[in-house]
């Protein structure tokens, strides 16, 4: 099966999922990659600490600077070929929004030593840096597995 439409999901869509979106998107240029939250702060920009960590790692900030949090919808779930979530509890949250999406929902950290990627919201910069590395490692693995 081809996974051409990838949706990355966290809680609020202001920290982890937008960062993962902007890490994975350039590695899979032929795929549609987007992000959303199960309890999104709709319209809220990316957390300033996320932008700071992205800047320090020389990521393209164009998408993060204009990011507006999106609420996960049943339609988004049906559109996606693969839904990558940050924590095991998000698998159930996705299924509650769209039961048909359960079979295509996996943990972003599935292939890493630590499957759950903790929420960095309202945490210090050192925690953001740790979470960044977990997300970057997971995205690198997924990019290799999904490369066509």
Show where each model-derived region lies.
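Short polar/charged helix/loop
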Residues: 1-148
């Amino acid at each position: 099966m081809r996974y051409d439409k990838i949706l990355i999901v966290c809680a609020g869509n202001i920290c982890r999922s937008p960062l993962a979106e902007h890490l994975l998107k350039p590695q899979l240029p032929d795929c549609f990659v987007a992000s959303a939250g199960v309890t999104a702060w709709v319209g809220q920009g990316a957390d300033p600490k996320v932008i700071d960590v992205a800047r320090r790692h020389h990521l393209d900030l164009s998408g993060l600077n204009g990011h507006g949090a999106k609420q996960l919808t049943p339609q988004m779930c049906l559109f996606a070929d693969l839904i990558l979530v940050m924590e095991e509890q998000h698998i159930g949250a996705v299924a509650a929004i769209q039961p048909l999406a359960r079979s295509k929902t996996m943990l972003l950290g599935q292939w890493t030593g630590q499957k759950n990627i903790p929420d960095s919201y309202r945490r210090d910069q050192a925690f953001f840096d740790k979470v960044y590395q977990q997300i970057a490692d997971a995205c690198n693995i997924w990019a290799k597995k999904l490369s066509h």
